[in-house]
Amino acid sequence: VTMSRGKPLPVGPTARLKDGMSWEKLSTMTPEDIKEKNVFPYLPLPHPNHATGGMLFSQIQVEKFPRLKRFDLDFDIPEYFLPEFPPAIFLTTHKDKGDVSQGKVVTLENYYELFNGLLNPKQLEGLRLLVTQFPQQQFNATADRKSEKPSQGVTCFDCHLNGHTSAATHLVGDIRPQSHRNRLDTPTLRGVNIQRLFGSQRALKSIEDFTEFEQRAAYFDGDILTAIKKGTNILERGSQVHFMAEFQSLLDFPPAPKLDIFGRLDTKKATDSEIRGQAIFFSKGKCFKCHPAPYYTDNLMHDLQVERFYKPQVINGQYIRAEGPIKTFPLRGIKDSPPYLHDGRLLTLEDTVEFFNLVLETNLNVEEKNDLVAFLRQL
C-alpha cells in the first residue's frame, strides 16, 4: 500500500518504550499506573524551539522553495514520515480525471495553466489568492522576521500544499503563556466540504471564517498589533473569501477503491485482514464512536483526557498538561497525511493505533492491531 502518488507508507510503531515495558504490558496497566511510573510513550510534542515557535517547513519543501527557509531552525521530522511531495489533487467536480496536479506543486506561476478549463473564473480567482504570498509573523518585510532576506510572506498553500498538507508546523495562536501553547500539525484541506468545524480547538463554524480570520490574526500568533505592523491582509468577504472557500470546497478525498457508497469495505475486494480490521473499528476498538462512516468524522470535538497518563511537566520548553477538546478529523484518506494527532506526535498509523489502544483502554492484541491498521490504509 502506498500514498496516492506512490510514496511508501511509513511503518511503525516508532515510539521508544521505557526499559522493561512492552506494548502488551502497557495495555494491561491502568492510566494511574502508567502516570505514576512515567512510562506513557506518546507525550505531547513540543515545537523544535518552543520559546520562539512560528511557522516551520520541511527540508524537502525548503529545498524547492528557499524563500521558506528560516535562519534559526530546521524541521525536526524526517521526510520518511511526511506526506508525499508534491501531493495529488482530487476535485469533486472532476472525479473522472483523478489527480489533476500533473505531478506539480501549484503556485502563482502555474495555477492558471493547470486549472484553466477545469474551474470557473470565480474559482480560479480563489485559487490565485490561495497561492499568493501575504505577510506572516516569521516571513515578512520588517526586521522582525526569521528569513534571511525580507519576504513577501507565505501562501495558504505553503502549509496546505496542493490543497492537502506539507506537514508544516506552528504553535496554536489561541493559548497563552507561550509555554502552554500546543504544537500544530497542518491538516489536509481534502474533504472540507463535509466538515462543520475548523481549527483544531477554536471550533470556527465555516471554511469562510477560517479563511478570513487565519490571515487577520493566526498568521501573527494571535497578536493583532504585530499583524498591523507587519502587514495584515484584510480579505473582502464577498469577492475574495467566498472565492477562496469555493475552491477549497472542491478539494476531494482521494479514491478509496475498496470502499462502497456507504464508506464500508466491499467484501469482494477487501482482504480477510482488512475485513477483520473493519469489524474491530466498529466494535471493540471504539473508533466508530467519534469516526462514523462514510467520512469517518462526527464533526464534533472530544476531550480524550490524555493527561490521565502523564504528570504535568516541562519538556523542551513546553509545559505539558491537560489539552482539552480537539476536533475529530476525518479518517478518509488518512494514509496520505502522516504524521497524526493534532501535534504530529504519532508518526505512523501503527503509532496511532497503539496510542488509542492505551487512551481508550481497548486492550487489543497484536493481530487485532495489525488488522485495524490494514483497514485504516483502505479508507
Residue ranges and their predicted role:
Residues 1-379:
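Periplasmic c-type cytochrome electron-transfer domains
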